[in-house]
Amino acid sequence: SSLPSLAITGASGNVGGTTARLLSERGLPLRLLANTPSRAPELPGTVAVKCSYEDTLTTRGALEGVDILFMVSAPESEDRLAKHLAFVDAAAASGVRHIVYLSFMNAAPDATFTLARTHFHTEERIKASGMTYTFLRDNFYADFFVELPDEEGRILGPAGDGRVGVVAREDAGRVAAGVLADPARYENQTLDVTGPEALTLDEIAAILTRVQSR
């Protein structure tokens, strides 16, 4: 294939978009895989190709010639895991050598958090595929907490005094770009991606109040 051998999904989103922009700025040619190619960002050295999270001839064609693949997880849905597994199968069948997967902190089969279980099973499918892998286990996104306060400014949740090392989506994208620019350094590794400090929900609420009242 004459298309770039480094491919990225989710480039129209936050983390994938940051990753694509930073790699483009480094001068790396990119194949942007998108369900709607017209929504992919127009960046120097990039080409948008139609691709969805399924194992179809279209998906395999979009992945043909890809050496390194950055897989951002699919949008939340009832069949999210099935889509992930199908996409991993398509990547392996298409000859992808190294897959960098955007996973989640503490992904495990018995995790209380549903999405962490989905990410675990996706990781296991990738390992079983024989492809080289790098798992980026992002913590909760700091940007997510900005949207949580109710009309009275409260963040309600079953967290108690639990702490979370929230990370900005922008920073998660920077980590992904760093890995994709030098993938051999991170082969078959699992990296936890967190913020600089573990905070309680009360502390997060106080920070949001301080920042938003400026």
Located regions from the model:
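N-terminal beta-loop-helix "entrance" segment that forms/cooperates
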Residues: 40-48
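Oxidoreductase cofactor-interface core, primarily capturing Rossmann-like NAD(P)-dependent enzymes
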Residues: 1-41, 54-66, 75-85, 89-98, ...
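Cofactor-binding loops of NAD(P)H-dependent oxidoreductases
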Residues: 51
